[in-house]
Amino acid sequence: MEGLVVAAGGDVSLHNFSARLWEQLVHFHVMRLTDSLFLWVGATPHLRNLAVAMCSRYDSIPVSTSLLGDTSDTTSTGLAQRLARKTNKQVFVSYNLQNTDSNFALLVENRIKEEMEAFPEKF
């Protein structure tokens, strides 16, 4: 990306990838920071919702909340919780796909896991 400024210690990393899932092209944008991760998932350039999750020493389930958008749509918060548990980082997730089918969301999550296994340094 042109004009991208990365901190001297490599504290910021950007990673983009796409996948065709059920005939829909889905784009993924990952921004890895020192102790946190931002993940945007969508087909069009919109930020309709945003959730955050982080691990707590008081509970095995990461705490999460919706920061932006429809609070009844728990796709972002659920994904943020699972990624926070897996990475042990504070995770921000913006899931912006119209398809709310749970099987489709599982395909999206599996694609993210594949990318995490292939490029662990990006997460």
Swiss-Prot record:
InterPro entries: PAC4 (IPR032157)
GO CC terms, sorted: cytosol; protein-containing complex
Keyword Amino-acid biosynthesis: no
GO BP terms in the entry: proteasome assembly
Keyword Chaperone attributed: yes
Pfam assignment, any one: PAC4
Membrane-crossing segments per the record: none
Signal peptide as annotated in the record: none
Keywords: Chaperone
GO molecular function: protein-containing complex binding
Function: Chaperone protein which promotes assembly of the 20S proteasome.
Subunit structure: Interacts with PSMG3. Associates with alpha subunits of the 20S proteasome.
Entry similarity comment: Belongs to the PSMG4 family.
Identification of the protein by name: Proteasome assembly chaperone 4
Chain's gene name: PSMG4
